[in-house]
Amino acid sequence: MGLKAMHAGHSTVLIGRRYLEHGFLDVAMRLFVRNAAQVEKRDWSLLVERLMDRHRIVDAVRVCEIGGVPVPCAQLLALGEGSLRRKDFEAAIHLYELGNADRERWARVVDLLSARPDQERRAIALTERYLVGEAPKVELRLAAAN
């Protein structure tokens, strides 16, 4: 990359920071993505934080991937718990998947789903994906220990 192009990239990132400071997240995100190699981790993290504040989950996860910053799992799981309390199963499941929910959380989802006959297939699918897959490993370890 030539010196002129590098300066242009840095200038664009500086302008992206200004847009971010003023709350223009879409413009900041577009400028950061175009010049991803020159954007600092703290800029990506701040953009993710602001996107999460506005509940723009998909954009926040995408920015984490592009910027190489951690996905805000704790926030995603907290939002998932709120969705679960409201019985918004679709949102809760999506947020739990993004936030890498633990076995206990998945068990709660399955418990709530299994209380509703219309959710039978979903409860079975989630059990197979997140609960049953763990059990054989534990049983094998216990068998090996004896």
Regions found by a protein language model. Give the residues of each.
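Alpha-helical repeat scaffolds
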Residues: 1-2, 29-33, 59-67, 91-98, ...
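Generic helix N-cap/helix-start motif at coil->alpha-helix transitions
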Residues: 6-13, 21-26, 38-45, 53-58, ...
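Residue-level signature for tetratricopeptide repeat
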Residues: 18, 30, 46, 50, ...
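Positions within ordered alpha-helical repeat solenoids
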Residues: 21, 34, 53, 66-69, ...
